[in-house]
C-alpha cells in the first residue's frame, strides 16, 4: 500500500444563495430580542423566482433569495412544492447524470463522470471516474438502500473489479451500489492522488448524494459509505464529514488518527470498523483500538447514541472477512433532524462543510481552524455550546521516521468568540407556534417568535439538497 499522508481534510462546497425577482436577501443575524407574532401571510414566492434561484445556485452564482411569509399550516404543501422545483432545476442542469438503475451483475456496464482536474506539485491531472451503478433484489417501497463502496490502493482496475465481485457477494439485498474506480491511481503523482477524500472526489460525493436524493429509486434515509484498506481510510474520513447524510459507515482494514475523522460527529451514524489484529502497518490495528475506545466513552456519556461495531479480529492481518459489514449497516436508518447534535467543524483538503444537520456557519472565528458545536433542543429552547478545538500531540509513532505520524491527541476546548451561525428550525425540532429561546454558552442570544418563510425552505434546500431537511424557519446568531 502507498505511504499514507495524513492530511486534514474536507469541506464540501455546497450551494450558495442566488437570484430571483421580487425577492429580498437573507436576513442579517438577529440579536437577542423579543419578536412580534408573524405577520399575516402574503402572496408566496413564485415558482419562477424559486426556479431562478435554484438554477443560479446550481452553477455557484449568487443573487437575491425569494421570500414570502409561510403559514404554519402550509409547511407540508410548501415542502412538496419546493422539492418539485428543485428537481426541475436539477433536471435542466447540464451535467453528467446518474444512469438508470439496472440489476447489478458481472456484466454490468461501466459508466463514468468527468471530475475537476486534480493537482499535485504544481501539475494538473485529468480525472475521470469510472463506476458501476446497479441494484440487487426488488425495490422496497421507500427505495433501495444505497451503498458507496471504496476500493483499496492496489492496481486500480483489479481493485475495481474486485469491488464489483464483493458487492455481488454481500448479503444485503435489496440494495443499490455505486462502485467507483479511483481516477488517478498507481504511477500517477507518486500515488498521492490515490485518496478518496480529496477535493475532486468530494465534489463527486456531493453530486452522488444530490442526484440520489432526487431519484425515486433510492431511500434518502438509508445511505451507507464503506470500503477496504485505502477505501477504509476514505470511508472513515467521509463518515465523520458527511455524518448528517449517512445512516451508517463501515471502513475495513483501515484505522485513521482521529484528527482526520473526529468520532464526535458519529453520534447518529451506525459505525462499523473491522481490522485484523496483526494489521500493524501504519498502526492500523492500534488506531482502530483508539477509535473503539473513543466511541465507547461517548456511548457511555450519551446513552442510546454512538452505535458502533468495532472488531479487532484475532489472527488476521490486512486481509479479513468482509461479509459482516453491510448486514450490520443495513439494520440502521438515518436520523436527519436530531434534537441533539455534536459536530466538530473542520476542513478536509482545505474545504469546510457549509452546514451539518440544522447548523450552518456563516462566519467562523478568525484564526480558529476547528469549531465544536454541541446543540441540545429541549422544548422550545435551543441550548448551544460553541468551542474552539485545539489538538495537542499525545503519542507519535516511533516506527515511521520519514514522516510525522501522530497516533493520539488530547483536545483542548475554549469558548468560541467572533463567529456567526444559522440555526435552522422545523416542526420536527420544536413548536413554531410558540416563542423560541436560544442560549450560547449559557447566555441568552435570542428570545421570541420565529417567522416561517419560503426563503428558508428554498435556501435550506439548496444548501443541503436533502428532502428530509427542508427547514421553514431559521435564526441567525452572533457569538
Region locations from a protein language model:
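Bacterial N-terminal signal peptides
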Residues: 9-16
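Sec-dependent signal peptide recognition
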Residues: 2-9, 290
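Primarily recognizes the serine-hydrolase "nucleophile elbow" in alpha/beta-hydrolase
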Residues: 214, 221-267
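Active-site machinery of serine-nucleophile hydrolases
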Residues: 143-213
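Alpha/beta-hydrolase-fold serine-hydrolase catalytic core, especially in secreted/extracellular enzymes
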Residues: 35-65, 297-479
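The feature captures the conserved acid-bearing segment of alpha/beta-hydrolase catalytic domains
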Residues: 248-330
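Loop/turn elements at helix/coil->beta-strand transitions in domains of secreted/extracellular proteins
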Residues: 142-146, 172-177, 219-223, 243-248, ...
